[in-house]
Design a protein with these regions (language model features):
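Metallocofactor- and cofactor-centric catalytic cores in central/energy metabolism, strongly enriched
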Residues: 1-66, 70, 79-94, 98-109, ...
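A short alpha->loop->secondary-structure connector
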Residues: 73-74
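Conserved small/polar residues in nucleotide/adenosyl-binding loops
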Residues: 118-122
Length: 122
């Protein structure tokens, strides 16, 4: 059953010129159909260089956002639009705004594994 699904994915990605990027924590069945595997930043940088116009990110939301930020000319799809990272999503935008208001001479720094909504405020 899994092999049949993988075969269908391979056929569709070739037919639709899609590059599949998979974060290392994905299960083996997904890693086997991926064109590239790696950590989130390495995959986002790699997306800039692939010839495909469409990239399917098998990971969480911030990973797809980072791919789109670094490769704005690509159509970026997320394998599961509800896939989020609890750590990346625990930040509150109001907290960032409050810190910036209280400490205007300080610089807010956001890690790459942060939703773009918050990164843009840093």
């Amino acid at each position: 059953m899994i092999r049949d699904i993988q075969d269908e994915i391979m056929r569709l990605k070739k037919e639709n010129d899609v590059c599949i990027l998979a974060h290392l924590y994905q299960n083996d069945a997904i890693l086997e159909v991926a064109d590239y595997t790696g950590d989130s930043f390495a995959l986002a940088k790699l997306a800039q260089t692939v010839p495909n116009k469409t990239v399917l990110m098998c990971g969480v939301r911030f990973m797809a956002e980072t791919v789109k930020m670094l490769a704005p000319d690509k159509r970026v799809l997320l394998s599961n639009p509800d896939a989020g990272c609890p750590m990346a999503e625990q930040m509150d935008r109001a907290v960032i705004e409050q810190v910036k208001a209280n400490y205007p001479d300080y610089t807010v720094v956001a890690y790459i594994n942060t939703c773009l909504l918050y990164t843009s405020d840093a």
